[in-house]
UniProtKB/Swiss-Prot annotation:
GO terms for biological process: actin filament organization; actin filament-based movement; early endosome to recycling endosome transport; endocytosis; protein transport. This is Unconventional myosin-Id. The keyword GTP-binding does not apply. Binds a calmodulin chain via each of the two IQ domains. IQ domain 1 mediates interaction with calmodulin both in the presence and in the absence of Ca(2+). IQ domain 2 mediates interaction with calmodulin in the presence of Ca(2+). Residues 572-594 are annotated as: Actin-binding. The modification Phosphotyrosine is found at Y536.
Amino acid sequence: MAEQESLEFGKADFVLMDTVSMPEFMANLRLRFEKGRIYTFIGEVVVSVNPYKALNIYGRDTIEQYKGRELYERPPHLFAIADAAYKAMKRRSKDTCIVISGESGAGKTEASKYIMQYIAAITNPSQRAEVERVKNMLLKSNCVLEAFGNAKTNRNDNSSRFGKYMDINFDFKGDPIGGHINNYLLEKSRVIVQQPGERSFHSFYQLLQGGSEQMLRSLHLQKSLSSYNYIHVGAQLKSSINDAAEFKVVADAMKVIGFKPEETQTVYKILAAILHLGNLKFMVDGDTPLIENGKVVSIIAELLSTKTDMVEKALLYRTVATGRDIIDKQHTEQEASYGRDAFAKAIYERLFCWIVTRINDIIEVKNYDTTIHGKNTVIGVLDIYGFEIFDNNSFEQFCINYCNEKLQQLFIQLVLKQEQEEYQREGIPWKHIDYFNNQIIVDLVEQQHKGIIAILDDACMNVGKVTDEMFLEALNSKLGKHGHFSSRKLCASDKILEFDRDFRIRHYAGDVVYSVIGFIDKNKDTLFQDFKRLLYNSSNPVLKNMWPEGKLSITEVTKRPLTAATLFKNSMIALVDNLASKEPYYVRCIKPNDKKSPQIFDDERCRHQVEYLGLLENVRVRRAGFAFRQTYEKFLHRYKMISEFTWPNHDLPSDKEAVKKLIEHCGFQDDVAYGKTKIFIRTPRTLFTLEELRAQMLIRIVLFLQKVWRGTLARMRYKRTKAALTIIRYYRHYKVKSYIQEVARRFHGVKTMKDHGKHVKWPTPPKVLRRFEEALQAIFNRWRASQLIKSLPASDLPQVRAKVAAMEMLKGQRADLGLQRAWEGNYLASKPDTPQTSGTFVPVANELKRKDKYMNVLFSCHVRKVNRFSKVEDRAIFVTDRHLYKMDPTKQYKVMKTIPLYNLTGLSVSNGKDQLVVFHTKDNKDLIVCLFSKQPTHESRIGELVGVLVNHFKSEKRHLQVNVTNPVQCSLHGKKCTVSVETRLNQPEPDFTKNRSGFILSVPGN
């Protein structure tokens, strides 16, 4: 039941009518048409009235409103039925089909396009490129087929002159992966002749109006439509179709689908050749047939890539083989014209079939493996010509109306007859509803040996000249007593029928008078073999492939081909069988008037269509019947999770009992009936509620399964990780053990080696032991060092420690650290170094020891110092374990300044061989000096000074910062300055000079 619409628009579902009667049905249909509501439901059938105007109800917003919704949730629409078919296909993996029926001009083709548009819009949410390509090609194929298969008729500006059934293939996710198109009975006679007020196929007009000047010149065409005999009837007609614009649309669509440029060019050449064929005129000179305008033959030969003489011969002669003899039989003027027209019709029909085949080659599913990709399901869309009643109804209308009888029979079988039969078979209480079964009309046309088609085939196979009048006579004799057949001979008082020309069939849609003129010829569908050989021998490979039977030898005897009517009958039977195997959804199209007006609702015209479409009977069956039925097993399989009594498995005696328990649990027992093998649900709402409950439970089931599966995965991962960690642990243990064993092997006996293993190369450790290797090497180096110093006297150990400290601080930063000599330390007390003054210095040192109570002398030396006033003087420094003294040697080593060592923050030295050193203090009163020695001259003592001070600070667990830079940064009473070192060749001894940034220490060059 449809919802979401106000009652001012009438009943959205005819099932909701207060009384089921034709007046109420028509009143509701008219009201909805006048209010712009062109769609109405009959349960799951959509009734569509052609609005004859554009409506803004097919956009993206509307698509989103219907996507995934149930039928009753939204107002009636084509999108609702399309979504229902799509959901049924996706949910139940069931092939579905949408059958669009109605008479010519009722809007079937437009409906099929909107359905395709909707399916394309709601699929492929992941935007897979291949799926998008397939969707695009399926949509584009519509406009190509319309161009070559549709035409303007008196009833419809875009009338389908062929039948089309398209299968859209979907993968297991519901995305389109391909398709296949079947075409039925192209009205090829329209190529050569049209009724007044009608046109030939759109393709001819599009080429002439839309082709460029250059293209038309290459095809020897001109834009004037009246210049071509085959289309001049419709040349003067005013049409709402923009042929020039459509030409570009079709050309672009062919390119998108995958037609190669040479294939598209061949299509245009064939169209041009047909137009030129129509302009050929024949005459007879004596007994010789001639072509009046021979130049046109050359143009046709050029366009068909054949030789001019071969084209001319095929048009004027017919090759006849009698035994081994081959005879060229001349045509009469009439026979030549007939052959020309048959040739034009055949070329166009082959072209159309080739276009369909080419599209199928491109869009068909390839390399689809159900074991890998899952089940391949199908939605079929049938857009076939509607019921036709013209002023002059010929063979084509006979076939078209037979097709509609077959489709009506299918509707009756599936919707009316089978439905009622199933209720009786399942034991469901049911009141029979009468309906007209058109099986008798179908049998009248197609019955073996007795039907009209069988009689027509017999007439075509008779030896000798058989006329259409003879065929009508056969119909009269064999079908004279049939209640749905009549002719003037059978009903002499019926003056509507013409003697020896007309017969009438009482179709389900109304009485139709057919003219037998042309029935025999059109059924034989004769085309001389000469034309087939002509095109098979074309140098154009596309044309050649269209005519494979042309390769047969002239003398080869072939089986009589099936007639056009029999071929069509067989294709209709196959189509109906195909549709019957799928779950059908119906769109019943109604034409509101014959004037193509958006304002007129012709009650009589519409009532007639409602009657013959059986819509009122459809409403009665729907109101009395059930919306859904399913076997107990399948129903249980789908919905068992919504009841605790059936999930995960039931323990009841049968599936039927389990289904009853499930329905009672949900509270739907008043809306169902239980058959012998199936459950029947009356209203769609109950089914949709079941679907909602199922969807809710599926979320919980999925979450439960996810939880269990994630737990399983976590346990599996834990076990794998634990096993991996065990392997890693054992492997690391193995690598560590191997490494330790290798170290032990290599360093075995190092105690007895002269260098205590210095030359032994360490093995490469595993990554995990790299830091351990560093620690191990440190331990080894300490051990080796301990072995080396064992032989040294205890008095030398402080000097060794100082040298080590100097190396740690200065190695790689200064060249000469004085490591090779013995470090004297207290050079001021050394007689070799200061023989004249050592005697003076020693008493001063002793007095300072008594006064300041220092324990050890760390370093003493003569220096040259510079102060903040840029005054350079010779001084001496005396460093003990407590103080740093600056002394004046000229005044018997008088102490000029005392700096406690705890006030010392660091040392700065240069990176050269000079003896510059800056003592940094906490009060920013740095001491800048240059060490110098007297014996030997220029001895480097920087390394010694740094080593003893660093070693002393380390022993007191303090850190002394040592900087190696050039220039050296310092601070004199808070003023920042720099001391840079320069080497000068003529400099006799180190000396300080002032510059802008501080001082320069000039030292002698080498």
